[in-house]
Structures are given as structure tokens and as C-alpha cells.
Amino acid sequence: MLKEEDKIFTNLHGQQSHDLKSSKKRGDWDNTKALLDKGREFIIEEVKKSGLRGRGGAGFSTGMKWSFMPKNSAKPCYLVVNADESEPGTCKDRDILRFEPHKLIEGCLLASFAIGANDCYIYIRGEFYNEASNIQRALDEAYKDGLIGKNACGSGFDCNIYLHRGAGAYICGEETALLESLEGKKGMPRLKPPFPAGFGLYGCPTTINNVESIAVVPTILRRGASWFASIGKPNNTGTKIFCISGHVNKPCNVEEAMGISLKELIEKYAGGVRGGWDNLKAIIPGGSSVPLLPKSLCEVDMDFDSLRTAGSGLGTGGIIVMDKSTDIIYAIARLSKFYMHESCGQCTPCREGTGWMWRVMMRLVKGNAQKSEIDELLNVTKEIEGHTICALGDAAAWPIQGLIRHFRSEIEERIKGWSSAI
């Protein structure tokens, strides 16, 4: 369990003002110049030592990602912050944008300095109107105070940060589709390689990081990599914001240590499952893109490795709780419809497969299908998984795979009930 003094996001629930004066009282922008004076290599190495892994879902080492940027590029380098949070069940970045904007902006400055980028873009979800307003106000305050812009914090480093609003496409959360959108084109994922670190925004070296990944950097540098690495578990270090929604008594966002038990997280912070733990049916532990877990597996630790072993994933940390009143087949069918709607249509397996899967899922919801179609559906998910340019195909396939893996008997009963009624 995370100690109060180890919390990074001390205004996560907006109890205090998010303006610059209040943010400074909470420790933001505290002698940032001294951190910059330590040099780029120090910052990258410290982030590496901390064990910070990307908080957007992939879990790749943040420091390692920064080290891929060229040291002496003839082209300008860019930092892009992915604030296009659109994953069903996920709202952690939204609260950072709302209530902790200066943590993000300070993190942008430090990360930009580390990778040699004089320009940073925050790409924010189009629907986040109020959050975009908060970020813009915070940027204006930071510019006025000399914290960013020319000679940021008096360090001699120039760093301009721009806010760019998206237009409501979930696919633009994929890093290369985001770059396409930022360039003014239709948001469609690029083939990799080349990777953004070599050929990113405007064909220049670019690093793309999640909001939470960037916002924790200033605290890591102030308190030290060893402090951050001491929280959580080996290879799964630090704190994480978890979003708990669904059939719980008190839905909430909470910052906790990586590796906390899923059951403890729900019972301590969300008031427990509606109707008690025995009324639990299943949980999606990491946003809609990861396979669900049945009640028998729901005391798993919330970290990358433990959830992978359990057959799911940490993803974004968006925990969706479903009690026994849930029509689990329809719940997953609803997610199938979401992915069908959000597919950009570039890859045939995803373009054709997501629609096909949704139509079959809706027949399974009614029971109007043959039992053989369950295996046929599973085979189609495996044909889509790993055969698309981006991970949206995987995201569409995994919820269905989880459903069939753990609730096949319920699907078969639904089919049997329909057949008996005819």
C-alpha cells in the first residue's frame, strides 16, 4: 500500500486550485533549473534507473525510449505528449489534465531537454474541452513566469510547448496515427519501421509519451530513481493511477503502488463490489482492450507481469467491475461495436474482421447461433491479432478471446436456450 508521503499526484481529486501559485506550494517547479543543470544524460539515466515503464498501455521503458533519440540530429527533434485518452473505462489522464496541469508541463520541459527537443506538442482529445482550457491557462502562466519558452527557467534552454486539439478519433491514440493527425492528415497508423525516433513528426526524430509517464518525471528526478524503484515490485516499479468503474459502490481514480492486489484496490478505495465480493462476476483490469478476468482470478496483483501471467494485461489501469447482474456476452459485444466503429479501415483484417466479429457477437447475445460458431469466432480473432499495422486489431480481438476462454459455457447455454425455445 502506498504511503501518503509517496504520492506524486497530491491534487488528483481537485481539492485545491490547479493554478501556478497553488502548484508551486505542492512542490511543482521547485528549482527546476537545478535539474536541467545536471544535463541530459543524467535525466535519461535517472529515468532508466527508476524503472518507469510507459503508463499508456505498452509498458515500454520510458528512459530507454528517450535514449533512442539521436544525440546530434541535423533535423529538429520533437516531444509529443499523447493526451488523446479515449479508451473505454479509462479517465486517469483527464484528471491530470484537469487538476495537475503544471506537473505535466514541467515534465514536458524536462523530457524535451533530455531528448534535445525545443518544441513539444500536447495532443489532447477533442472532447476534453475544459481540460484543454486548463492546460492552456497553465501554459500561459508558465510562459509568463519564464518557466517555459526562451531561456526556460533561466537554464539557457529554449522550450516551446503547444496544445493541439484532436477531432474525436480513437485511432489517433495510436502514436503514428497521432503524428499523421498532428500534421493535418487523416489519422491513420504508419508502417513501422521507420520508427518515430528516426522518422516522426514532419519526418524528424520524435518521442511520443503518455500524459502520466511525463507527469511523474519531475518527482522522480527530485526524489531520486532509487525512491521510485523502491515502490512496487521488481520490473513493475513506482506508482500508478487506477480508474475503478462499473459495479462498485464508489467509482474513483486512485494513485497506488504497482503490484497492489486488485481485490484490495476495489475494497479499500471503491467501497467494494456492489452486493459484496461474492456478487462479482468478472473484471476488465486494464481498459477495454485487455481480456477480462473471471472472479476466480480477480485477486491478482495489479502490475504488468502478474496480469500477463493471468492471461490479461495492465493496459491503462482502467478497472471495469461487472457483478452477476451483467450480461457478460452483451458487455463484450458492446466493446466489439466500439472497435468496429473506431477502425480506420486501412488494414483488411481489422476493417472486415471487426464488423464480422460484432455481427457474430450479437447473434451470440441472442443465442441465435451454432455452437461451432464459437470456435469459428475464436479463430477469426486469432487471424486478426498480430496481422494489422497497429494494435487496434489486437484490442478488438482480446476481449472476445477472454470471453470465450472464461465464459464459453455461458455462451453455449445461451445457444441451447434459444434452440430449445424454437
UniProtKB/Swiss-Prot annotation:
Single GO MF descriptor: quinone binding
Ranges for region Disordered: 1-26
Residue numbers binding NAD(+): 54-63
Enzyme Commission no: 7.1.1.-
InterPro entries: ComplexI_51kDa_subunit, NADH-UbQ_OxRdtase_51kDa_CS, NADH-UbQ_OxRdtase_suF, Nuo51_FMN-bd, Nuo51_FMN-bd_sf, Nuop51_4Fe4S-bd, Nuop51_4Fe4S-bd_sf, SLBB_dom
Keyword NAD on entry: yes
Cofactor note: Binds 1 FMN. Binds 1 [4Fe-4S] cluster.
Record: residues binding [4Fe-4S] cluster: 344, 347, 350, 390
UniProt keyword annotations, A-Z: 4Fe-4S, Flavoprotein, FMN, Iron, Iron-sulfur, Metal-binding, NAD, Quinone, Translocase
Top-level lineage group: Bacteria
Enzyme class: translocase
Catalytic activity: a quinone + NADH + 5 H(+)(in) = a quinol + NAD(+) + 4 H(+)(out)
SUPFAM superfamilies: Nqo1 FMN-binding domain-like, Nqo1 middle domain-like, Nqo1C-terminal domain-like
Cofactor(s) recorded in Swiss-Prot or TrEMBL: FMN; [4Fe-4S] cluster
Ranges annotated as biased composition (Basic and acidic residues): 16-26
Translocase is among the record's keywords: yes
The family this protein is said to belong to: Belongs to the complex I 51 kDa subunit family.
Function description: NDH-1 shuttles electrons from NADH, via FMN and iron-sulfur (Fe-S) centers, to quinones in the respiratory chain. Couples the redox reaction to proton translocation (for every two electrons transferred, four hydrogen ions are translocated across the cytoplasmic membrane), and thus conserves the redox energy in a proton gradient.
Protein name: NADH-quinone oxidoreductase subunit F
Gene from which this protein is expressed: nuoF
